[in-house]
Amino acid sequence: MEKETILQHVREQANKWLNSNIDEATRKEILYLLEHDEKELIESFYRVLEFGTGGLRGIMGAGTNRMNIYTIGMATQGLCNYLLKAFHGLEEISVAIAHDCRNNSRLFAETTARICTANGIKAYLFDELRPTPELSFAIRELNCQSGVVITASHNPREYNGYKVYWEDGGQIIHPHDTNIINEVKSIQSIDEIKFDGNKNMIQSLGEEMDEKYLEKVKELSLNPDQIRKHADLKI
């Protein structure tokens, strides 16, 4: 694809976002890219950040190829659409949500919870950062149908990620991964995302879940006596 063709494409995508219902900070960032930073504009809009078998992962910023509340929103809306189909007839569908300490992780987790509840899906949201294994435990403990953790694992600090888990506490596998990917791809516009959440459908998770998780971890210890014996081991 020639540079002029690429530029035309990314400008069209950027203007499509500007004509959508986006926040003022994102709008200003896009306008700056259009006027002052052609290279970053191309990087931000030349493609759509791909939702793969593990979810999303990318650099944070404005644009279709960046991690932001709108790409997170499209992923969550697609997930919700699939959950409503997969568990049609279930009285209550619920999702557990956790996050790490990266920039914007709390914002992305709260955005995920809002969109879930806007779709009539209950959200269990940890009150602050938690390890991914505790998210998997919470899914099973609360009988959730799915879970999301906001993390980019080992990637540099400018990255963030969005990983989806199923009702067994494990990451999504076939056929659910393919079906969710297809639902996410079907979201063509920011305006299709339901952001208007219901606070009454968001339940905070805290110390009580921590205690249950730690008790279960202790139960799985292969040799508790040895652990107690060497509890003063320095690392």
Locations of regions flagged by a protein language model:
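Cofactor-/ligand-binding subdomain signature composed of acidic, glycine-rich
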Residues: 2-74, 183-191, 223
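Ferredoxin-reductase
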Residues: 6, 17-18, 90-167
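Gly/Ser/Thr-enriched, mixed-charge loops and adjacent short helices
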Residues: 17, 40-45, 49, 160-235
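N-terminal cofactor/phosphate-binding cores enriched in small/glycine residues
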Residues: 49, 53, 68-69, 76, ...
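Gly-rich Lys/Arg/Thr-decorated short loops/hinges at beta-loop-alpha junctions or inter-strand turns
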Residues: 50-66, 90-96, 114-118, 187-205, ...
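Phosphate/oxyanion-binding active-site loops and adjacent basic polyanion-contact surfaces
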Residues: 67-77, 104-105, 127, 131, ...
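Generic structural signal for well-ordered alpha-helical scaffold segments
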Residues: 77-85, 136, 214, 218-225
